[in-house]
Each structure stands twice: as C-alpha cells, then as structure tokens.
Amino acid sequence: MSPARFTEITGRYPALHVVLIGDFCLDRYLEIDPARRETSIETGLPVRNVVRVRSQPGGAGTILNNLVALGVGTIHTIGFCGDDGEGYELQRALRTLRGVQTSRFIATGYRRTFTYCKPLLMHRGTPPEELERLDSKNWDPTPAQVEEHLVDSLQEASVQAHAVIALDQVDHPDTGVVTARVRDALGHLAAARPDLLVLADSRRGLGGWPAVGFKMNAAELGSLLGGQAPTLIDDVKLQAGELARRNGRPVFVTLSERGIVGALPSGETEHVPALPVRGPIDIVGAGDAVSANLAAALGAGADLRSAMELAMAAANLVIHQLGTTGTASVPQLEEALGL
C-alpha cells in the first residue's frame, strides 16, 4: 500500500458511521501485589491483596475500542448490560469514548452484565501473570422484549451506516445479543442493502447464519463447509472463495501467524502474511482488532488487499500490548506498515 493510499483510506474515517451490535462485556483487571500476600485469620486460606482495579469495555467493546482508536467519527452501539454495578461501570466507560453513541445501548433488569474478571499477579520487570478468570454470564434466553429493542435499534441505526459489525460472544445460543431473531434481522438488512458491509463473527462459528460477510478462522471454515480445517493457503483461498460466491458476501479467514485470507463474491482472493513478532505476545484482542480494521477500511472504500494489510498491522500492534486488551491508532498503523 502506498502512503497516498493509506492517507486516502484513513482520512475518511472521521466521516464514517459504523454500527456495532453484539455482546459488550466488562473486562475488570485486578492487579495483585504478591509481596502483600497474607493469610486469613478466620479461614487460614491465603489472601491476595488487590492494589489496583481497572476496567474497560470488552467483547464487542474491544472492537469498539479499536474503532475509537482509529478515529471513526460515529459509532452506534447496540446491546445491553444488566441493571447492576458492572453495568454501571460499563455504561460509564462507553460514554467516555469519543464518537460513541450509546442511546441504543440499554440496561435491563432481565440480564446480568457479561463480565470477565481477570486477576493479575504483578511481578516487577516481567509481564503480569494471569490467574484463573472469573466470569459472569447469562444462562437463560434473552427475553423477547429485549430482542425487539435490538432489532428496532439495528434498523434505525443502519440507515446512515457505512458498515455494520456483529459479534456473537456467548457460549450458549440465544442468551446474548445476537439471537436467532437478531441474526435474521442482519440477514434482511444485508439483502436490502447489498452495498453495505455487514461483517459477522461468532464464538460458536457461523453455521446457520444468513448471507452476510463472514470473519472466521480456518477451523471454523472447515466446520462450516463440512470438512477439516484447510492447512494450505491455496486451499483456504479456494474454500473462502467458494463461500463468498455462495453467500454473495466477503469472507475473511484468520490464520494466526500465517496472516489472513480474504475473498470477494467476484472471485478475487488475497492472502496477506502476518507481520513479524518481536518478543513476548498476548493474542487476546487480536481478532477484534482485525474486525474493526476490516470494517473501517472497507467502509471507507478500501480495496480488499489494503483492508487486510491494515488489519494485519493492527493485529501485530495489539498482540505486543501485554496485560491489557490493546488497540491500534492510525499513526501506529502507519509506522507498522513502514509508510
């Protein structure tokens, strides 16, 4: 990608409207000082003393953080949190982010706030040591009245959208934001607006999804097509191309250290290698950075390869940020690409 092309694409970000619908969660980091370890007088069990607590939006919020870091002008968030303390923290964090519209993000007593609580042992001079995570989730189906709000919000917000991102983060179907009813609404939107990028990613794979843009890994691609995960790049390109033509929508397949493959319904396929790794890494959040950068770039009119190059640069920047779920800004991308 030339410097002029990079500037042309990223220069359009402030004018973009991106809709982000999905499972927003609260990432809460508990920083523990191992030197302050005590023993409980009452139970005799070890006590870990938390010296700092920091919280940030996770799940779909990680995609949001990356869109904000890119300088996307307006981001419409659609989702829910619980009417609880974690929900208050999450809403407060969302409202502080530049360009983020939260009027369609609701707190409801019918749901708990999806929370990842991550205890970290802080060792001087070395990366944090992550202990067992504590999760808070919903286990019952999302109520119909909440689904109705989500579908109505999607229809309203997408009118002026340049791109829509949908993230299904929950392990149990229909307990989060992207229920079967919401997936149907996304399919209807994509059919009605063939020029609009609707990019979907799901923790459980994209089987049963309507014809929208897909972002997945090789194992998910193989499973979706009823076979094994393709191992050769040419096979990934072939299968991604077949799926893109079948759905009439773009397909992106992440390949970890081997980069990413993208395919368009027109038959165009590309492979962009990953950038080199430098020292310790943490892959958490890399996939969300890829989603954000693909959507922003394609929404801004980027060609397939340019969008994928930006996504790979973002992923490389994010994995080198330890002890947090990182982001990548436009100046950082420019430096990473050597422009």
Question: Which positions does each model-derived feature cover?
Answer:
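Flexible glycine/proline-rich, aromatic-decorated loop/lid segments
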Residues: 36-44, 211-219, 259-287, 336-337
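Residues that scaffold the ATP/ADP-binding catalytic core of kinase and kinase-like folds
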Residues: 28-29, 224, 263, 318, ...
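A short, aliphatic-rich alpha-helical micro-motif
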Residues: 13, 158, 207-209
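Conserved phosphate/ATP/ADP-binding segment of small-molecule kinases
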Residues: 171-269
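Active-site metal-binding loops of divalent metal-dependent hydrolases
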Residues: 24, 169, 289
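Structural motif
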Residues: 19-21, 133, 162-167, 199, ...
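Conserved post-catalytic alpha-helical subdomain immediately downstream of the catalytic base
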Residues: 241, 246-247, 275-336
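Conserved N-terminal subdomain of the carbohydrate kinase-like
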Residues: 15-18, 26-166, 332-339
